[in-house]
UniProtKB/Swiss-Prot annotation:
Protein name as catalogued: DNA-directed RNA polymerase I subunit RPA12
Segments forming C4-type zinc fingers: 10-30
Annotated residues for binding of Zn(2+) 2: C80, C83, C108, C111
High-level lineage: Eukaryota, Fungi, Dikarya, Ascomycota, Taphrinomycotina
InterPro entries in UniProt: DNA-dir_RNA_pol-M_15_CS, Rpa12/Rpb9/Rpc10/TFS, Zn_ribbon_RPA12_C, Zn_ribbon_RPB9, Znf_TFIIS
Function as written in the Swiss-Prot or TrEMBL entry: DNA-dependent RNA polymerase catalyzes the transcription of DNA into RNA using the four ribonucleoside triphosphates as substrates. Component of RNA polymerase I which synthesizes ribosomal RNA precursors. Required for growth at higher temperatures.
Gene name of the encoded protein: rpa12
Entry-linked CDD domains: Zn-ribbon_RPA12
Keywords (A to Z) from UniProt: DNA-directed RNA polymerase, Metal-binding, Nucleus, Transcription, Zinc, Zinc-finger
Binding site for Zn(2+) 1: C10, C13, C27, C30
Compartmental location: Nucleus, Nucleolus
Length: 119
């Protein structure tokens, strides 16, 4: 018998054994027999981290931010380098230190081409 966490496997064939209240546990695959008392005092300790359970609320918050940024985008007369459209939408973010300029993100409404520049 081999145990990995709360799962118990047959030592002969590796089949997963079913837990039972009977005196003996029998492997359904190879018919090996194990005394059930071996499994009675099995202690399982689990550990997890916050990253193992992603927050649905946090994910929703990120999606809302992206959508709100799209709504706040302004339009400028700038030629798209990809399709030649005369207008592009843009928004700015302060990604670098406060004493440096902001980053301008452009997006073409026609072909969805995106690029950014540092001011």
């Amino acid at each position: 018998m081999s145990a990995i966490g709360s799962l118990i496997f047959c030592s002969e064939c590796g089949n997963l054994l079913e837990s039972t209240t009977a005196q003996w546990t029998t492997c359904d695959q190879c018919q090996s027999v194990y005394p059930s008392e071996q499994f009675a005092n099995l202690v399982v300790e689990t550990k997890s981290s916050a990253s193992a359970f992603p927050s649905a609320l946090k994910l929703k918050h990120s999606i809302v931010q992206v959508e709100s940024q799209k709504e706040e985008a302004a339009t400028i007369e700038e030629k798209c380098p990809k399709c030649g459209n005369d207008h592009m939408t843009f928004h700015t973010l302060q990604l670098r230190s406060a004493d440096e300029g902001s980053t301008v993100f452009y997006e073409c409404p026609r072909c969805a081409y995106k690029f950014s520049t540092n001011n």
